[in-house]
Amino acid sequence: MTDPIIIAIDGHSSCGKSTMAKDLARAIGYIYVDTGAMYRAVTLYSIRRGLWKDGVLDTETLRDEMSDVRITFRLNAETGLPETYLNGENVEQDIRSMEVSAKVSPIATLDFVREAMVREQQAMGKSKGIVMDGRDIGTTVFPEAEMKIFVTALPHVRAQRRLDELRAKGDATTTFDDVLANIEERDRIDSTRAVSPLRQAEDALVLDNSHMTIPQQKAWLLERFQEVTGS
């Protein structure tokens, strides 16, 4: 049996990183960590605490209260997938709302938020054997990761995928244009922020999944894993 490694999967929003990371982790027996869910949980906390006034975040209050934000993952026995908990409450569905999606990128630009999240993520990966997806895993969190993937897809493809997810969850009001505008704005913020901007690591393998099925993506990732580990 080969020694466990760290697998970093980075890329744009709504390009299917979480789905492929979950599938890969399950197939190879690794732990999956959804770092995007961590930032979404902080965002949900800020919304529930009323820290947004007229679209502006009270960053100083959030900074003062970051020590009160506890994010954990627990395995759902029925689905076999990890779910996100905020201060002991299952918020897996709540963090996927459009309101959270609209505010998560500004939250993720805050240095004190990213520093806190990166510390947590690095602690989770100390023993290796993990698949972690996000925006800066291969560049900031684990620059030494043995396997790095950078995922991309056409904006309109990502928007349709995200809209399909929202419809499946009962959202009948959000439009395609709403989702596309949100994705394009998140791309802009993620790529231009001062702290840990979204960028492709020099040694990352690029996966454009615009026209790939989920099984095809899984097969591609498994092949790359076998090449890296020699298994």
From Swiss-Prot:
Q: Which GO terms describe its molecular function?
A: ATP binding; CMP kinase activity; dCMP kinase activity
Keyword Kinase included in the entry's annotation: yes
Q: Which reaction does it catalyse?
A: CMP + ATP = CDP + ADP; dCMP + ATP = dCDP + ADP
Q: Where does ATP bind?
A: 11-19
Ion transport keyword on record: no
* SUPFAM superfamilies in alphabetical order: P-loop containing nucleoside triphosphate hydrolases
The domain of life is: Bacteria
- Write down the InterPro entries for this protein, in alphabetical order: Cytidylate_kin (IPR003136), Cytidylate_kinase_dom (IPR011994), P-loop_NTPase (IPR027417)
**Could you tell me the Gene Ontology terms of the biological process aspect for this record?**
nucleobase-containing small molecule interconversion; pyrimidine nucleotide metabolic process
Q: What class of enzyme is it?
A: transferase
Where's it mainly located?
cytoplasm
Tell me the NCBIfam families matching this sequence: cmk
Task: Return the PANTHER family for the record.
Answer: CYTIDYLATE KINASE, CYTIDYLATE KINASE/PANTOATE-BETA-ALANINE LIGASE
Q: What is this protein called?
A: Cytidylate kinase
